[in-house]
Amino acid sequence: MKFSLISSCVALAVLVLSTEAAPNGKKVNIPLTKNKDYKPNAKNAIQKVLAKYHRHRSTSSSSNSTSTDGIGRVPVTDYYNDIEYFGQVKVGTPGVTLKLDFDTGSSDLWFASSLCTNCGYSQTKYNPNQSRTYAKDGRAWSISYGDGSSASGILGTDTVVLGGLTIQRQTIELARREASSFQNGPSDGLLGLGFNSITTVRGVKTPVDNLISQGLISNPVFGVYLGKESNGGGGEYIFGGYDSSKFKGSLTTIPVDNSNGWYGVTIRGASIGRSRVAGSFEAILDTGTSLLVLPNDVARSVASAYGARDNYDGTFSISCDTSRFQPLVFTIGSSTFEVPADSLVYEQNGYSCIAGFGYGDYDFAIFDDVFLKNNYVVFNPTVPQVQIATVA
């Protein structure tokens, strides 16, 4: 989950899907657009991801028109140097358009509301009294993170339009209070794409659950393309299919361990050039995190190979000249997938640079936007599995 300052965004043209996007099925597209003004902060990014997964450990043992083909395509905004992405979603009748952080590492759908006493001035606030399709739920929700940030409010149900597909009676979480880190963020809230076992309120169906159960998509997958700033930024989420023009070669199918509510996969090894720097470890595919977070021992091996220096805050300083770097290569399933040299720098401060990888105090990795902007992923929550290919 990521929050930061927002500026202007540029719409991304909707792209035509190939026939492979969703055989015999419906799909919707949510494009991503670009914002050049946000400045990254690696230390804050590490603190957010550590807090996010500590929280789960402790609590668990835009298209505005109606889609006629059932394909949901949603564009997303790409922040400065691919740091963050968000998409637009309509909630209510008449609908209010909200900018939401799409996050496969969580499962709640929550956003600022008119009931909020301290939500950010620039945030768009959903008003339940102005929606004809809103219904009260009566239950409360609250999210607290290890860094002290939090949000809380009440539950309700309403119509949610995702890439032109209309979800009926979707449970929504209306924020009544939120921490300053959310108030000053670029988005109005968060749309969780993880499994429903980690929703804050048990038994709540996620938007993906409802897309499937309400028959809005017949192919129960969503494809994720996160554009790189060097290629114009932007990107898109496609619900009900994927866009084969966005990747090279064929998709590699990887089984998913969803026992903790996440898209967990096994990384068989990591290498830089001809040097193997790590053996097998587990990883979570998380579109809501902006820094590649590795297990401590793996991170230090990778840092050593690149001559990076530990900053003792979860980040590494690295040379700003990436032209001499070889890509960081991960073996997943029967294939290898790269994080190229130009993605190894996350943040530049004068003559010093912060690496696009860091470390955490747990034994699994968080494969974030640094990995995902270089590799196309199709998520299938029903099998469960993911399919991965190198971006075109």
Swiss-Prot record:
Reactions catalysed, as given in the entry: Hydrolysis of proteins with broad specificity similar to that of pepsin A, preferring hydrophobic residues at P1 and P1'. Clots milk and activates trypsinogen. Does not cleave 4-Gln-|-His-5, but does cleave 10-His-|-Leu-11 and 12-Val-|-Glu-13 in B chain of insulin
InterPro entries assigned to the protein according to its UniProt record, in alphabetical order: Aspartic_peptidase_A1 (IPR001461), Aspartic_peptidase_AS (IPR001969), PEPTIDASE_A1 (IPR033121), Peptidase_aspartic_dom_sf (IPR021109)
Residue intervals of the Peptidase A1 domain: 85-389
One Pfam entry name: Asp
Keyword field contains tRNA processing: no
PROSITE patterns: ASP_PROTEASE, PEPTIDASE_A1
Keyword Hydrolase: yes
Residue ranges of the propeptide: 22-69
Biological processes annotated in GO: proteolysis
Molecular function terms from GO: aspartic-type endopeptidase activity
Top enzyme class: hydrolase
Active site residues per record: D103, D286
UniProt keyword annotations, A-Z: Aspartyl protease, Disulfide bond, Hydrolase, Protease, Signal, Zymogen
Disulfide bond annotation, renumbered to this chain: C116-C119, C320-C353
Source superkingdom: Eukaryota
Signal peptide per UniProt: 1-21
EC numbers on record: 3.4.23.21
Family to which the UniProt record says this protein belongs: Belongs to the peptidase A1 family.
Protein name: Rhizopuspepsin-5
Naturally occurring in which organism (per UniProt): Rhizopus niveus
